[in-house]
Structure formats: structure tokens, C-alpha cells
Amino acid sequence: MAAAPRKQVGKALLIALGGFSLLSVGDAVVKSMAGEWPAPAVSALRYNFGALGLAAAVALRHGRAGFVFPRPLLQLGRGAAVALATMCFFLGVMAMPLADATAIQFTSPILTALLSGLVLGERVPKAAWAAIAVAFAGVLVVLRPNFLALGGEAFYPLGAAFGMAWLITFNRKSAGDAPVLVMQFTLACVAAPLLLVAAGLLSMVGGPGFEIGRRSGDVVAKCALVAVTASTGHLLIYWATTHAGAALVSPMTYVQLIVAAGLGWAWFAEAPDVVSLAGEALIIGGGLLLWRSQRPPMPPEGTPD
């Protein structure tokens, strides 16, 4: 895109800051439901609320013409990818420190770079391989204390990053198929029933931590709030990207990690330690190295809430 005026860029970056901060607020709300309701059920209810809200928005903006489903198999792939990412991320933030889960999920652009070579046939630059090595060194540093304390649950955010990487890859293949709001609606329409099925199956076979019992009104309200913060956050990020460009907005993704660390400390008494900070710094460094190697850069996504 052509260079935007400085005042417009400043406004766009402030709006992006608000968008990424809202995503972290939603993540903190999800974490506050740990022990109240299983993460798969929370993710299913959140996406069903999201689908209803987006349906209303599509109807108001595009009318009946907005209810289309281009390239159904590709939409199924997008929905399955975001369903996996959301459920794994919610499981992760409920089990481990919010900042650690957020940092590990930020490896999704690194995984996307790998998938772009395997799936889209794009050349992966040498700098991207260096970024991959640095970021995954950071993941190992962050995972080690969490793995010792939690076991396999510590790998949930990595599953979320894998799902987001597939979503970004599918999004690039489906670019231009329909307006952005319509594409968000089709995404939610596929993810919502998939998450309902997953939550039901895990409730039957997943053990005590996955059993869906009676939910309180607070849980329903919190799930609705997460749907609102996520949809609003992604809309603000998209607006900022269209007005300032992905190259300027993408590095601001890491504001989300700073906000997550602050909320984790203030809300859940999760004071960051030196080891986690070192690992998170490596992940951010790898992400920034990847961003510098990309021309054009991938649009920012944030966490999959």
C-alpha cells in the first residue's frame, strides 16, 4: 500500500494497540473460568455466541448476499484449524501462566513460514530458518518448568500455535473469496459445531477435568464477553492493518504478551521469573527476525480467542 500520512499511521497504531490489548483481556477472562467449566465447553459456547453476533453483523452489512459459503472444503479447513487453536489455547491458559501460554502461541508465524513452503510452495528464506531456531529455543526454555509441573498439559499452547499456523495458511489461500466480515462468519459457522462435538466427546471420555456440569450465569456472561472482546479486537487489528500496513502493525503483536504478563501478575499473582522472561525474549526475537525477512509481511493475527 502507499505510504500513509504520519497522523493516520499514529492513529492506526493506537487502534492496533487497543485491539491486541483486548485479546489479552479476553484471554484473562478465559483463565478466570479455570475450575468453573471445562475449556472445550468454554470455547464451544464462546464460538456459538460469536457465530450469532457475526450473523447479525453480516445481515446488517451485506443482507442475504452475505450468507455465502465459497469453496466449502477450504472453509472446513479454516474452521477446523481455528477450533483446534482455540480449544488448545483455552486449555493452555487455564493450566499455566497466562504470559507463558501467550508466548508459546506466538510461534504460529514461525510454523506458518514452514507451512507456506510445504503447502503453498513458497521459498522459505534463510533468515526464516534462523528465526525458527531462535523461537523454538525460546519455546524449550518456557516449556521446561511448565512441563516439570504440568506434564503434557504444557504442550497445549503449541497445539494452539499449530492450529493458528494452518488457519493463516488457509486464509492466504482463500484471500478475496468474500468480504472479511463474511469470511469471519463462515469461520465461526464451521468452528462452532466442531467445538460442540469436541466438548461433548471429551465430556464423555476425557476424564473429570472435561466433564460438562451445570454452568453458572457468570460463566455464560464471561463467554459472551470473550466473544465480544475477540471480535472487537480482531476488527480493530484489521482496521489498523488496512490503514497503516502489515509491516507497521505486525511488530505490535507483541504488545499482547506485555499486557498478558501484566494481567497475569495483577489478576492471578503470576509474577514472571527470569527463565520465563528469557524464553519469551527468544520467542519475540525469533518472531521479529522472521518479520524482517518477509516481503511482504504476513498480516498480524494475535491469539485464537
Predicted feature descriptions by range:
Residues 2-3, 51-70, 137-149, 192-218, ...:
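Membrane-interface helix-cap regions at the ends of transmembrane helices
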Residues 105, 121-141, 147, 151-156, ...:
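Loop-to-transmembrane alpha-helix entry segments
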